[in-house]
Amino acid sequence: MENEQPVIPVQARFNSIKAFFVLLVRQFNEDGCRQSAAALTYTTLFAIVPVMTVSFVVLSSVPALQGKSAQLQEWAFEYFVPSAGNMLLDHLQSFAKQATNLTVLGIVFLVVTSVLMLSTVEQTLNRIWKVQTPRKGLVSLLMYWALLSLGPICLGLGLAITSYLTSQAIFSDTVSYLGGVRLWLAVLPFLFTTAMLTLMYTVVPNTTVPFRQGVLGAAMAALLFELAKGAFTFFIKQAPSYQVVYGAFAAVPVFLLWIYISWTIVLGGAELVRALVVFQEHQRQVPRMHALVRLLNVFWQRQQSGKVLRSKEIRQVMQESGISQWDEFRNLLVNANLIRRTDEGGYILSRDLRNISLGQLVAMLPWPAHTQLRVRQQPESLPWEQALKSRMDEAREGMMAPLDISLDALFSAPSAEKERHPEQQGRND
């Protein structure tokens, strides 16, 4: 049959799923997500009042939401915080209302505190995506302000829809055609949480994050958040002894613990997004060393013609190797002073490849030896790639002499220039 699809053996599918979760757990541990969640917990403790104050200001600027700040915060706490932390809401609202009476200098301090929290979140997500250069200047401030503005507005929209559905359930049968008010009241907060996390996962990191994987990771994090909230509430109800120990301050450690759990879930979702991207690319990509030398070859060609390689072109070059690897490669090559960024935003070689041998390149890289020396042979491999594989195979057998060749000499293998997409060279020239 022409329409028959190849059947993936159950064992192969199981091994693939197992490898994915191994990758996810390894990334979570290597990126220090638990330590980052702890740091964000304390940052949140200091920034929660400024963020609530900013939400007061944002909501008061929207005519339809004026006077709804207290109701919105109660609704947000009811959804996002287990019942054990609700007793803190009155105190936080009191602090936030008092903060609205501050002077201009005090308001600037609150805004700066809120921005610093978002900056910490950006740094954490950039570390997950292996990005070393955060956004700077006006672009960064605009993104932070957009997040501070959209968050309260999205919550306000959720509150408005919830109120509308509740009123429709009382006065008409409209909601029954849509599946019932209880179903929608349960689903809507989940959808808004997914939307906000999608915004965080795809917009905050200073790199290109695929939207589809961002939505999948956000939905999974929102689901885990719901499960964790139920489990946490059940635990608190079944183990009330903490109230005997802490007394009137019992809500504080419980609230801190919940913030830590929430940030752990959020960062776990970010790791899931990256794992989805990396694992999908890993299924079809060439080995990292091969991909890196390919990228250097493109830089070398541009150097020969005196041209700059732009980020958009680099991502096109790395489409087969895996776009997500560009951030790691850029960091490695910049730190090794092999490439540098131009004022126009492109990248060029900063060293003469005649003075750098293949062995020196291998020594610069932090990857394990078995990873560095792997090169994939393909039917369309260019002459220099065939020479690279031959030399790497000999090096894997313990003979390091084949690596004593400059990168310039490697790329100048016979017929290499003729074989490399002559139509593209014609356009570049």
UniProtKB/Swiss-Prot annotation:
Annotated GO CC locations: plasma membrane
Superkingdom of this protein's organism: Bacteria
Keyword Repressor: no
Primary residence: membrane
Its membrane topology: Multi-pass membrane protein
Key words of the record: Cell inner membrane, Cell membrane, Membrane, Transmembrane, Transmembrane helix
Transmembrane feature ranges: 45-65, 102-122, 141-161, 184-204, 216-236, 256-278
Localization in the cell: Cell inner membrane
InterPro entries the UniProt entry points to: UPF0761_bac, Virul_fac_BrkB
Pfam families the UniProt entry points to: Virul_fac_BrkB
HAMAP family: UPF0761 (MF_00672)
Family: Belongs to the UPF0761 family.
Protein name per the record: UPF0761 membrane protein ABO_1543
Species name: Alcanivorax borkumensis (strain ATCC 700651 / DSM 11573 / NCIMB 13689 / SK2)
Top-level taxonomy: Bacteria, Pseudomonadati, Pseudomonadota, Gammaproteobacteria, Oceanospirillales
